[in-house]
């Protein structure tokens, strides 16, 4: 059985969006692998309550890296740019925790799971001699400018500028570049991410939607 260490800031068994996505990945991976999961502590009680109810729960080992309530409010208040300073600090502490776990546990694979936005790849890619997986990767989709016809000048300027900044960051952000090129496997959340990684970095990735499911679940 493979042993995987996973970085997932957001995780909850009782939510959708990023927290629910991470939980769904974990409960399926844990059927086949031993997981060592570093996550933020907001939903610790819900996680610890859910684990004993799962047959694969014994394969899911959680390590909590909590932040303050104030920082959590910044996270949920989308658009609060102050959060990213603390999120970057959280990622560095997670990197330190991961190194400590790897020193004590037999780890086969490192996985950077969420948040899925490409702008913050964390630091686990810096760990040597372990295969590194990053994804699903999102945030690379360009806003269709055709949708801006008839909108106000403020909306047009905002979205056109956002598109340009996105491309600039994909092409020139040094840490993003290092994480992308270090990865043994890249996972794109949507085709737009796949094509952006291919176009600007000349790298291959596989497309697995963040809300992916088994074919059997569709029947």
Positions of PLM-derived features:
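Donor nucleotide-sugar binding/catalytic pocket of nucleotide-sugar-dependent glycosyltransferases
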Residues: 60-64, 134, 165-219
């Amino acid at each position: 059985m493979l042993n995987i260490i996973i970085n997932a800031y957001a995780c909850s068994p009782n939510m959708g969006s990023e927290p629910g996505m991470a939980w769904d990945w974990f409960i399926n991976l844990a059927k086949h692998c031993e997981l060592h999961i570093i996550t933020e502590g907001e939903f610790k009680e819900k996680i610890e309550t859910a684990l004993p109810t799962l047959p694969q729960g014994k394969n899911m080992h959680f390590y909590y890296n909590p932040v303050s309530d104030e920082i959590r409010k910044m996270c949920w208040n989308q658009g609060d740019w102050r959060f990213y300073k603390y999120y970057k600090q959280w990622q560095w502490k997670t990197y330190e925790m991961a190194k400590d776990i790897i020193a004590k546990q037999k780890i086969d694979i490192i996985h950077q799971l969420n948040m899925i936005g490409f702008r913050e790849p964390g630091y686990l890619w810096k760990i040597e001699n372990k295969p590194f997986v990053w994804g699903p990767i999102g945030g690379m989709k360009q806003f269709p400018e055709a949708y801006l016809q008839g909108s106000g000048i403020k909306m047009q300027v905002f979205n056109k500028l956002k598109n340009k900044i996105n491309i600039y960051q994909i092409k020139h952000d040094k840490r993003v570049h290092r994480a992308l090129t270090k990865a043994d496997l890249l996972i794109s959340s949507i085709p737009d991410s796949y094509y952006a990684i291919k176009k600007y970095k000349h790298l291959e990735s596989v497309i697995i939607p963040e809300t992916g499911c088994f074919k059997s679940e569709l029947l």
